[in-house]
């Protein structure tokens, strides 16, 4: 969430659950007294259901803070770049939002362009916010920090895991995968599940689908400075070769045009990587907990995943 001046930030503290907390530096000089009427512009993104959830939260906030008017703009975008472009347009036209919901991958860009204000003093001066901050894993907060300053609190996480079809494993006589399995074990399992027009795995060529592979191989697209490209590093090349090998061997469908989530729901793919965002889609398709489960991403050099 973004706040205007110091006292406005204090009044908005209970709206933190709306979104990532991120304060526009261009508004930081404005001081608003608690009894003044205030309008806060909120920029959010998502579908109609997500917009309704945010509006419900805003309504609850307004009940406790009748002098604060919250105006939400919810952008139904198809891509993250569309949302960022909307934000840039609002900023350059003098209509920058006070509160914004940002993905973790946008934080460095926003901080480096001096668009956000640190939240450390706000959180330290409020017991409720301090308690909320302490609920998060330190590794998660690192993504919303720069140097010694914290610029946001997440309203949710999307941890990449491998979902697998229980029935396909049962039919193939395979044990369900366990956390800590390796790339080699993953490929061997996917190969055994590939038969009769069914693929063992599907990896759509998207950032979130590919990142866990080089992350578990101790690699990244950029260096620790966040600027130096490392896309040709050994770890990334090895990850891409690993996936390309599975595609060439017929273990995975064509990655550009394949809809792995739909194929998984239709029993055409035994395993697929995703976050929790796909669960509603599968629920609507009739899948239940009896049909599938999830496991941590397979490991090459480094345990963990991406969120």
Residue ranges and their predicted role:
Residues 160-164, 214:
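Short glycine- and hydrophobic/aromatic-rich loop-to-beta-strand nucleating segment
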Residues 5, 9, 13-18, 28-115, ...:
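Conserved N-terminal structural module of periplasmic/extracytoplasmic solute-binding proteins
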Residues 33-41, 63-68, 145-149, 170, ...:
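Immediate post-signal peptide segment of exported/extracytoplasmic ligand-binding proteins
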Residues 104-159, 293-296:
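Hinge/lid segment of periplasmic solute-binding proteins
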Residues 65-76, 95, 173-178, 226-228, ...:
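A local structural motif
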Residues 98-101, 270-274:
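Paired acidic/hydrophobic, glycine-rich loop segments that form the ligand-binding mouth/hinge
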Residues 189-192, 226-255, 296-297:
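Glycine-centered hinge/linker elements that transmit conformational signals in sensory
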Residues 75-86, 105, 181-187, 253-266:
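Short helix-initiation/N-cap motifs at beta->coil->alpha
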